[in-house]
Amino acid sequence: MPVSGEAFLGLLPELVATGFLLVVLLGGVFAGPRSEALVAALAGLGTLASFAAAAGLLAAGFSGTFFGGGYAVDPFALYFKLIITATAFFTVIAAARWAERTGDAPEYMTLIIAVALGGMLLVSMRDLFGVFLAVELATIPSYAMVAFDRRRRESAEGGMKYLITGVIASSFLLYGIVLIYGVSGSANLSRVAEAFGEGLSPVAIVGLVLMISGLAFKVSAAPFHFWTPDAYQGAPTSAAAFLSVAPKAAIFAALLRILLDGMPQAAPTWTALMAVIAIVTMFVGNLLALRQSNVRRMLAYSSVAHSGYILAAFAALQGDAVSSGVQAVMIYSAAYAVMNLGAFLTIDLVGEEAKSFNGLFATRPMLAAAMAVFMAALVGIPPLSGFFGKAWVIYAGAGSGSALVYVAVAALVVNSVLSVPYYFGIIRNMFQEEPVSAGGPAKKGDGGVAFTVYAMALLTALFFLGVGPLAALAAGSGLL
């Protein structure tokens, strides 16, 4: 099949990322031991160039389906590519000094770009086997990122647990895809939708459940969440921050495309399943987060709960609420990316234990203010980014007309209240407790981490200024 120039143009963000991935990897080999700073700069340039390519295509109104309908470049995909490349860029900035000190900048930066590349491919896939390959491209480097810090035993343990559960999840996903392919006779989402025009057979339902289960592993949805705290605690802080947002955004985008493009007739089945998973995930994440004194593990369980909030929007994808449900997923993904990336990276500047934040306002007031913004946003306090994500989910759920979705929305409200003690506990420690030492916090970070934290705090606080354009973009995403 000949590849048109238009297809190459649509693939520009991925091609740019691939080119820089090779340059970064080979740069570490040929430039010698003093290439760490150069490699980090090239990685930052590559992720920024991919972001610019995606932004240019979006601004130009580019849209098309290529490779036999198996790959779509539309506003929906480009929106998520912007999230993925932006988080990759800021992760490179935050990780640069650490990677230079360890002498592993080429390898670490290559992994960041590889995860971003897999995510970009994933959000455009309209072929189920392509989805599987893109998921693997995004997750295999993730295993290495979690286990990357060879000096810490927890890193190896977290990486091993992540690898084992990831392999199980991939098996579920692939088996589900094979069942769907066997029943429908195609892996292309358009043809799958045609084959299931009159509803899903029992075998197809099993395949659907297995696919959703496999992807639920990847986004830390309960009961498939158990790898998350150990992986995030063991990973380098920049890796935990990046993996908590970028791959998850890509998985949510892929799941939206699979369900709405490939199985719209089965919406009553998968929306009910999503509602149940969402409710369980919210409660599991928040109840376990309440028990944590380690802030990194607390944020890991918090990420489980937020996956539940986003899955509640999936449950609302029925009736007149489909459009608002898609908007909710898209807006929440952007909102969560900025506030969670910043919250995780703040740990690098302060410390992992809750007591490390004691008296932070007295010693580093700007950093304390930034962390307070992140914690309040994760609760959903207006007008911060998290509020708009949750508000859109509630709005979509209210318009769904489903009693089960109403329960999921009520669970979201209850769990938001349930999360207040552990988020605001950090704020209380920073503003009311005595500093951990006379000299200030126990740990200081570098300029790249601080820059990223303050940038994310600013984006979190000013998110309301971009909600209108984001909502308009989501409404015209081209998915529906």
Swiss-Prot record:
It holds the Pfam family Proton_antipo_M. InterPro entries: NADH-Q_OxRdtase_suN/2, ND/Mrp_TM. The keyword Transport applies. It catalyses: a quinone + NADH + 5 H(+)(in) = a quinol + NAD(+) + 4 H(+)(out). It is a multi-pass membrane protein. GO terms for cellular component: plasma membrane. Its EC number is 7.1.1.-. It is found in: Cell membrane. Keywords: Cell membrane, Membrane, NAD, Quinone, Translocase, Transmembrane, Transmembrane helix, Transport. The chain crosses the membrane at residues 11-31, 38-58, 76-96, 105-125, 128-148, 163-183, 195-215, 240-260, 270-290, 298-318, 329-349, 368-388, 407-427, 453-473. GO terms for molecular function: NADH dehydrogenase (ubiquinone) activity; NADH:ubiquinone reductase (non-electrogenic) activity; quinone binding. NDH-1 is composed of 14 different subunits. Subunits NuoA, H, J, K, L, M, N constitute the membrane sector of the complex. Belongs to the complex I subunit 2 family. NDH-1 shuttles electrons from NADH, via FMN and iron-sulfur (Fe-S) centers, to quinones in the respiratory chain. The immediate electron acceptor for the enzyme in this species is believed to be a menaquinone. Couples the redox reaction to proton translocation (for every two electrons transferred, four hydrogen ions are translocated across the cytoplasmic membrane), and thus conserves the redox energy in a proton gradient. This is NADH-quinone oxidoreductase subunit N. It comes from Rubrobacter xylanophilus (strain DSM 9941 / JCM 11954 / NBRC 16129 / PRD-1).
